[in-house]
Amino acid sequence: MIKKELGRSGIQVPALTFGGNVFGWTVDEATSFSLLDALVANQLNFIDTADVYSSWAAGNKGGESETVIGNWLKKSGKREQVIIATKVGKPMGAGKQGLSPRYIRQAVEDSLRRLQTDYIDLYQSHDDDRDTPLTETLAAFDELIKAGKVRAIGASNYQADRLVEALQVSEQNGLARYDTLQPEYNLYAREGYEKALEAVAQQHGLGVINFFSLASGFLTGKYRSVKDIGKSQRGDTIVTRYLNPRGLRILAALDQMADKYRTTPAQISLAWLIARPSITAPIVSATSLQQLDELVGATRLQLQAADIRALDEASRVG
């Protein structure tokens, strides 16, 4: 498995990041443990989660994903074999959100307790917090790194101008800097990242671990008509957003490439992302070992330059 560095952090990660939002939500603990064991066995040992996962599920309040991962770490004893990324900032109850130093200090202790570890490899701002000065937020993160509780920090859902400002604040004040960026990016949703964020990431040497890599499942080819709405709880939203002339054009190109490489649209979509020079490790999830095997296959797939250009053209906006 080829490894890439997360920004300038010195942390080496595989070609894909596993999205831990499924833990405590769409897979039970036993299945989660099987998936985590299989990830390590296949060298896909970079796991991304967040304190807020999976608060949206009935009966949950947040922290479920971290708890499952922590239980697995305790049972397996494989802490040194995995890279754990989590996030802070989303609402976790009354007065528990944002990026104030007080809350960051509280939230990191909660995450460490749930994960049953004494350090987090990558600690990320889940959202920008414009109510807290960047200097205060970054100073709090810097404190965590110096204390050995966090190895590196990253930003998720930041706009380009604010990301640049944060990087400047770090440099001017001698504080830890964001080494990673987590934006939405896939073969369909390209403009938001490519228009401004990509240049910032490349100029400042940031590692990019993008989410919605398969456009909520649309790029797997699962949703091709309004009749497919019932295939998942998110079917209505997916069909409404992606099922249009451009989306169908992308699916047609993926089908053509899948036939050529004797693989699946999902693997082609991920291979396209992996081939992007600015992308470090796209985030993608699985709920079964069969789906996980498909992810592993994507890391071995190398698209020809002409085919990458064909996918670029098929997904062009406008």
Language-model regions, residue ranges each:
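Beta/alpha (TIM)-barrel catalytic core signal, keyed to glycine-rich beta->alpha loops juxtaposed to Asp/Glu
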Residues: 132-318
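A short acidic, helix-capping loop that chelates divalent metal ions and anchors anionic groups
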Residues: 53-58, 91-96, 294
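Active-site mouth loops of central-metabolism enzymes
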Residues: 20-30, 91-102, 131
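N-terminal binding-site loop/beta-alpha segment at the start of enzyme catalytic domains
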Residues: 1-81, 146
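Short, acidic/polar
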Residues: 28-39, 99-114, 163-168
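Active-site groove signature of glycoside hydrolases
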Residues: 112-131
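Active-site beta-loop-alpha junctions enriched in small/polar residues
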Residues: 21-23, 52, 87-91, 125-128, ...
